[in-house]
Structure formats: C-alpha cells, structure tokens
Amino acid sequence: DLHSFPTRRSSDLHIADVMYVVAVAMDQLVTKIVLMDLQNRYVSEVEKFELSLANNREALSTLTTRIDNFLNNLSIDRSKILGIGIGMPGFVDAAKGINYSFMHANGQSMNEYISSRVNLPVFIDNDSSVIALAELRFGAAHNKKSAMVINASWGVGLGLIINGELFRGHNGFAGEFSHIPLFLNNKLCNCGKMGCLETESSLLVVIEKAHKELKEGKASLLKGLPHDQVEQACEVLVDAAARGDKLAVKLLSEAAYNIGRGVAILIHILNPEIIILSGRGSSAGKIWMAPIQQALNEHCIPRLCENTEIKISGFGFHAELVGAAVLVMEHYDMSYSPKKGQLLSIVDSTVSTSL
C-alpha cells in the first residue's frame, strides 16, 4: 500500500535507548515534517502545511518557526534528536547549505540559520537528490551501481546514482531533468527558457490541461476539479485515473510519454541499470509504465535499453521524508554516536521489515 507507512507512538518507545531524526520534505507549495526513529519508522504524525516558496521572503523564517514549534510539541527531549534533514526544490548547494532558488538567508547558510534557532544540526539538499538517497539506501536502487530516480511532481526532477553513490555534480546542481529542451511548443518555462520537458509533463501542466479540456465540455470524473488547491486536484486526478477515467488516463499517459522521451536521452548517455519513478506522481502507479516504455521503444536504441529495468517506487509520497532522514544519518557527527557506520547498519538491518 503506497499510502501507508509504519508509525509508532512515542509512548511505545524506550526513550533512553533510542535516538531520532526530524525529516522535512518540501516542494514549491507544501511542506511536511515528521519525527523518525533510527529504524526508519515514523514516531509522530506527519505535520503538513502550505508554504509557497516562490517570491516569498518570509519562507525561511516561516519554515524555521514551524520546525521549532514541531519540536516544542514533541514529548521527546531535543538531546535525543540527532539532527534535521530537509529536502527542498531549487538549485541547492548541499555542501554550503545554500538554496540559490528559494529561501535566501542573506549570505548565511540555511543550515546555520535554522540550526542557530532550533539548537540542532541541520542538513539540506535538493528534493530529487534526497528522494534518490531514499531509493539508494532503502528502496529499489539499493545495491545498484547505476540508477536514475525520476521525481515526478510539480516539476520533473532527477536523482543520479553513479558507481553506487549519489551524483550531485560540480556545484550540487546535477539532475535538472525538467529543463531538458525537448519541445518546440513556444511555452515559457519558469526557468526562463522555452520548450523544457516540464512545460509538457509536470503535474501542474497536467492539471492545467485537465481544466482546459473540462472547460471545453469533455465528459469526465474530473468534473469539479479544484482550481486553487493543486495538491487536492492532483489527488483527484490520480484517483480518477485509477478508476479508469479516460481523460485522466490520457493526460497522465501523455505526460509519461514525454518523460519517457527525456529518459531515452539519459539512457543513451548513462546506460543505467534501473530507472525508478518516484515522488508525488508515482502514486499513479502502473499508469506511467506503458507510455514510458513506448517512448523508449520509439526513441532509444534497443541494445541500450533492453536490460534497463523500469520500476515504480514503493515509497510513494514518503520518499522525500525517508531521504531527508538519511541525509542526517549520512552527516552524523561522531560526537553524537560511537560510529557512523553503526548507525547506518542499524537502519539497513531493519528496513526490510519497516517498509
């Protein structure tokens, strides 16, 4: 079940024997926060709230306040929390703790800004990289040497696994799959360029196309699709597709085919062992598979793609939260634990029964 995840109440735990991490998953519109134990399980309810990042000078302050309030409402002392991992959209330099697209901290790293206010170590990374970390450590990319993790959401992100490690590129900006110029459609992307993959295949575009077709009188279960609540609209769209609605299936299939065209280019360059569709859009499940495969059939040299596995993530909406927790574990300060390796081995040994 893609919509369930193990949860344990803090009262069920022996607090003195365990440590925790706070995982924060952000996209351009919605943020989620949860407390997790080192066995990769939710210990608190997921707190979700709207936080628009574009042109929002208060976004960083708001995020910090929400994290601090979340911590204050826990029954667990902050000394039991190893740190806070945050996945977020944008051009993120994880090493410097800077997001060049959103939530500027006036020259200070976001890590330092948030950490100084909540008194815990903070680590940030791009949302698609964080999702790829989740797949690499605990998901479909585990023990794979090369993998491409597609983050189908309001944009179309990419996490690259090369030689068994997350590849971030020179400045940490690798994986801007959304902005591969694929179309001569005269559509302006939010990056300022024309014809990017995102302009035909993001979930925002799919919802926009749905509204257009409904306005033209197309019969569909999508009638009444929300206009100003895109997350709810996305859920309605995916649910309608799962129920066999022709319009919903058509729109998602078109997006999937276009993503497949982009994937064909990447396969020619990287020849990966596996391609994993993850992130928000993965909740549509097998609807994505046939159109992506059809695009590969048409645009990819058979010898290059015939041994590449395509898989839907088992994490569903949880991928970014799991990856944010991994982000803390991978940066674990030696002063907080005997050995980083011991921490990771604890998680690895339990993940098969936790997910």
Where are these regions (language model features)?
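Short, small-residue-biased leader/transition segments that mark boundaries at the very start
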Residues: L2-S10
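Gly/Thr-rich phosphate-binding beta-strand-loop-beta motif of the actin/hexokinase/Hsp70
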Residues: R9-E45, V149-I162
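Hydrophobic "anchor" residues
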Residues: Y42, N99, L166-F167
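Glycine-rich phosphate-binding loop and adjoining helix at the ATP-binding site
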Residues: E45-S146, I287-E298
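Glycine-rich phosphate-binding/hydrolytic loop that grips phosphoryl groups
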Residues: F123-F138, S282-L355
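Glycine-rich phosphate-binding loop of actin/hexokinase-like ATP-binding domains
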Residues: N143-S201
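A mobile "lid/hinge" subdomain adjacent to the ATP/sugar-phosphate binding pocket shared
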Residues: L197-H268, E273-I275
